[in-house]
């Protein structure tokens, strides 16, 4: 099964996340199929959230299931996601 989820990177006490498409059997920060964007929860810059909406829609159409946090971020960028 493929999920759209967050993968942590950044230094200690300064988290940043990649929004990635990954197989559920892979570790959180392990290999992924495709990166869809990035998210800075500390909002240190104007573009703290960037998502490739076209590719996100493609993966959702292919059956990728977003995690709860990824679902919230995708919806904030206008990606249409059906109910669970």
UniProtKB/Swiss-Prot annotation:
It comes from the Bacteria. Keywords: Ribonucleoprotein, Ribosomal protein. The keyword Transferase does not apply. Belongs to the bacterial ribosomal protein bS16 family. This is Small ribosomal subunit protein bS16. GO terms for cellular component: cytoplasm; small ribosomal subunit. GO terms for molecular function: structural constituent of ribosome. InterPro entries: Ribosomal_bS16 (IPR000307), Ribosomal_bS16_dom_sf (IPR023803). GO terms for biological process: translation. Pfam families: Ribosomal_S16 (PF00886). HAMAP family: Ribosomal_bS16. The keyword Ribonucleoprotein applies.
